[in-house]
Amino acid sequence: MSSLPKYQEIYRRFRQAIDQGQLRPGERVPSVRALAQELKVARGTVETAYQLLVSEGFFEARGQAGTVIAEALPPMSVKPTPVALPGTSGPRPLQMGLPALDAFPRKLWARLVTQQVRRTDADSLAMGDVRGTQALRVAIASYLALYRGVECSPQQVFVCAGYAGCLTLVCDALAMAGQRCWFEDPGYLHARQLLEHHGVELVPVPVDRDGLDVEQGMAREREARLAIVTPAHQSPLGVALSPARRQALLEWARAQGSWVVEDDYDSEFRYRGQPLAALKSQDVDDRVIYAGSFSKMLFPGLRLGYLVVPVSLVEVFERGAHALQQRSAQMLQLTAADFLEQGHFTRHLKKMRQLYAQRRGYLVEALRVHCAAFLRVDEQAGGINLLARLVVDVPDRAVAEAADRAGLAVQALSSWTLEVGRGQGLMMGFTNVATAQQAKDLALVLRSVLAECAGLSTR
């Protein structure tokens, strides 16, 4: 049984038959309906395969005369554009939250790892400090002071196993089980799931064009113990927390004795305007716990996140870290420290900003050309994902499920909401859309899915 999505299996069968001369220019191919019935698959599945073949010049659609093999075929040396990567550990098409894995400097990273291996001594083979290696904590503190305006000592930095490890440590150190927490609505799905797993009572706070609505938060639960926010680039709407609301949030935390977790999500990837200052850089009363992660900037398998905690919380977080014993591999931490200290990290981010702006443009243009009847892409100043609003009356979860069956890893906006009525849309990643042709192919697949869900035909 092939692990390929069915539409791609049909596509490849036709390509093979054309390349081997079994199907010749001008020959008719079965209608979408006939082939779907013969193969016992949905019409949209066959339609998607046919659209890809038309887009690459192998089929010609002749209206009522049907579809035929193109008279002027592309050369055989032109390989089919990969639309999906099934059966591998690589990214799925349009998968969110991933950096461009093809652009990571693997040779440089391997050299740094090798250097660390050569320096291995007895101490580096031990369990290590539960707060993280001193070298990485120093490097993080230095980077944050220089590039995010966050002044802290290495003693305030706690290295965790990814962002999930950061939230786990926060929940444990602050004894959040049964406590109330402001949570952006819509907000980061995996964070919501993890907080609920730890028994945190989430208070949904609406997000609008100015970010988290602090007045709504105070009206709903003024005495919440914690607020979790993404002020630089809200996840998933992409808006920034306005200066007035930043100040209101900090004043609320000071007045109530509450804490704010700043998830500095995607702040490094901004494509227009100046980078926004971290909320922590404005935190004169020391009520903000700053959270960052290397997973979306380097590679997800690194599983390295970090917290910068207020001075008053260092001891309680140390106790929490000792209780949890969630260490990341020392070798990876030391390699990451070298990557930061030697300037490779900032050079990599600069390169990725340029690359992501280009790849974002590929996908936005492809969606505009091929999916405008179904979607409207939100304008966002940065980030590594797109949000496209549905302009047809189709449930976004139904579209996401159908897209998943077609091999696309899009997500429904409504899945990221706590309260109903927050909008319908599709979220998708663009960082691994390497070419304009690949973006076009993906948009055609998505268009077919949308048309099928809307009960329309794209032929």
What feature does the model see in each segment?
Residues V157, S258, V288, L375, ...:
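Short, conserved active-site loop motifs that form the nucleotide-linked donor/cofactor pocket
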Residues P99, P231-S235, K296, V433:
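Short glycine-rich anion-binding loops that position phosphate/pyrophosphate groups of nucleotides
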Residues Q64, S281-V316, S328-M331:
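Active-site PLP attachment segment
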Residues M1-Q116, T120, L125-D129, L136-V138, ...:
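N-terminal basic, amphipathic alpha-helical segments
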Residues V113, R118, D123-Q256, E268-F269, ...:
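Conserved core of the PLP fold type I
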